[in-house]
Amino acid sequence: MNRLFYLLFISAILFSCDLNKDDKKIEFIPNLTDLNNNEFKLENYEGNVLIVNLWATWCKPCVAEFESLEKFKNKFIGKKIKIVAISNENKDKIKAFIEKRDFDLEFIKLNGDLSYFNAYSLPTTIILDKQGNESFRIASGIDFTSNNFVDKILVLEEL
């Protein structure tokens, strides 16, 4: 019964996502770097569906969804789907967090405020189509392996 409720809840969240494609391109986000201080640009991923996961080490729902995010990533290796996990926390704190948990995702440091993404709660996941336009966003923790989410991403990947 709990599982059914959970699946219905997740489905309701995903169906309520904004699927309006008004070419909501995310403008240049200043000061994005990888954890080795190399400049990172979202534009480098055009031609791929990009899953941008905004998170923090102190955010329990953020941490909880990483396992399903990694499962999703591993299931679709070779597809035109990329994932980046962006946090604005201290780089050393992010590195220590990753080392303890051994996540294999691309972690990016935002040297600024998450409001650049118009994100005001965590976790927030923003899906960009192959042209870099925002397709939809989810402002809560989700199961990235749910059929509903996977189907939406695969439709974008085929376009």
Model-derived regions, located:
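Sec-dependent N-terminal signal peptides
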Residues: L4-I13
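Conserved redox-active cysteine motifs that mediate thiol-disulfide chemistry
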Residues: L54-K71
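Short pre-active-site segment immediately N-terminal to redox-active cysteine/selenocysteine motifs
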Residues: N48-L50, L54-W58, N90, S121
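Acidic helix N-cap motif at the loop->helix transition within catalytic regions
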Residues: K93-K95
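Thiol-/selenol-based redox modules, centered on thioredoxin-like
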Residues: I127-L159
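N-terminal "domain-start" segment that seeds a small globular fold
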Residues: C17-L42
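Active-site acidic short loop of glycosyltransferases
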Residues: Y45-N48, G78, D104, A119
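Short, internal strand/loop/helix patches
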Residues: V84, F97-K130
